[in-house]
Design a protein with these regions (language model features):
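Residues lining hydrophobic/aromatic ligand-binding pockets adjacent to catalytic sites
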Residues: 1-147
């Protein structure tokens, strides 16, 4: 991975998404940092929660890229197909995930504190309706904003 990342043009922002927590090693984060690449925090079936991914990055010395990214894909422990079956027709939030939302807010606050940009995408299969998931995260962020 490190060799591949070093070959990438430097005039673009890159993120690597892994979906196996055993890959979140100090060597992984070192390879990202040496190439100016960030980890794509992902909320996915078999991945560890976002806050544990953030902890793994912090324990390895942090991320040095100038941005963070998170993808909210499915509830933990729920396959893409099962989420699709449970949440269709995606017209409302069907299973709010307070921990996932709080973790995203934590990532956004970290971005602000370190003067980095943050990108967050949500899939309808995360809670049932991605626009409403994003609205809920924005409200949570604003509710807990310092005056």
């Amino acid at each position: 991975l490190a060799e591949f990342l070093q070959q990438l043009p430097r005039d673009f922002q890159y993120a690597v998404e892994v979906r196996n927590s055993e890959l979140l090693t100090p060597a992984y984060f070192k390879a990202l940092n040496e190439a100016g690449v960030t980890h794509c925090f992902n909320h996915w079936n078999s991945m560890i929660p976002l806050h544990l991914q953030m902890r793994a990055a912090a324990d390895a010395g942090g991320l040095t890229a100038d941005f963070f990214i998170a993808r909210l894909l499915t509830p933990l422990g729920t396959s893409y197909q099962n989420a699709e079956e449970q949440f269709a027709p995606y017209d409302k939030v069907q299973r709010p995930n307070s921990q996932m939302r709080a973790d995203v807010v934590k990532l956004l606050r970290r971005a602000l504190a370190t003067n980095k940009r943050a990108f967050v995408t949500a899939n309808n299969k995360a809670e049932g309706n991605s626009p409403l998931t994003m609205v809920s995260i924005a409200k949570l962020f604003l509710e807990n904003a310092a005056p």
